[in-house]
């Protein structure tokens, strides 16, 4: 058992050393990511049928200072955690599962029932409907909800990084082209 614990600790340490950081100009927000290349599974997705995805925009509102959780995925785009709905799950279950897969953070499905839902149909695929639930929380334990406490393996090859970022800082670093947001997240930010 001791050997296993030591192996897990060393594995996490090695993965932490591979992490890169993006800081906002003020230094108050840090996004952690890796340059590891993902080998995404080729999903046989029919563009002929209607499909649904779901996710959560987790917004922390601490002393009138709003921060949002964003993850990095395909094409190094950053955005709210979301993904394809499986046939055996509800939209809320899908949203909760995707947050765990992309950030390691667990959100109870029952706490999402009263959340406002944002519906987005992307221009590139009119047969896809994305449901995002706005989830406001008063504070977050950044120590337990940080990349430092995750192995890359924990992210299920769905994410190459994540972080909490102040909405003002996010606006500044996207204008400076330090990071690039996906179209869904740009849409959501206009609704917050």
Swiss-Prot record:
Mg(2+) binds at residues 98, 102, 158. Keywords: Hydrolase, Magnesium, Manganese, Metal-binding. InterPro entries: NUDIX_hydrolase-like_dom_sf (IPR015797), NUDIX_hydrolase_CS (IPR020084), NUDIX_hydrolase_dom (IPR000086), Nudix_hydrolase_domain (IPR051325). Its cofactor is Mg(2+); Mn(2+). Belongs to the Nudix hydrolase family. This is Putative hydrolase 414L. Its EC number is 3.6.1.-.
């Amino acid at each position: 058992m001791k050997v296993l614990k030591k192996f897990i600790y060393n594995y996490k340490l090695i993965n932490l050393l591979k992490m890169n950081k993006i800081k906002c100009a003020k230094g108050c927000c840090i996004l952690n990511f890796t340059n590891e290349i993902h080998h995404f599974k080729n999903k046989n997705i029919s563009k002929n049928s209607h499909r649904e995805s779901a996710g959560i925009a987790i917004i922390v509102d601490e002393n009138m200072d709003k921060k949002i959780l964003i993850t990095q995925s395909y094409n190094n785009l950053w955005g709210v955690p979301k993904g394809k709905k499986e046939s055996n799950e509800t939209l809320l279950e899908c949203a909760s599962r995707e947050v765990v897969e992309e950030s390691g953070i667990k959100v109870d499905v029952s706490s999402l029932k009263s959340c406002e839902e944002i519906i987005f149909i992307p221009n590139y695929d009119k047969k896809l409907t994305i449901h995002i639930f706005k989830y406001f929380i008063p504070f977050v334990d950044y120590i337990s909800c940080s990349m430092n406490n995750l192995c890359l393996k924990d992210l299920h090859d769905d994410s190459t990084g994540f972080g909490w970022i102040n909405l003002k800082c996010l606006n500044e670093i996207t204008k400076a082209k330090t990071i690039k947001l996906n179209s869904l997240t740009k849409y959501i930010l206009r609704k917050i």
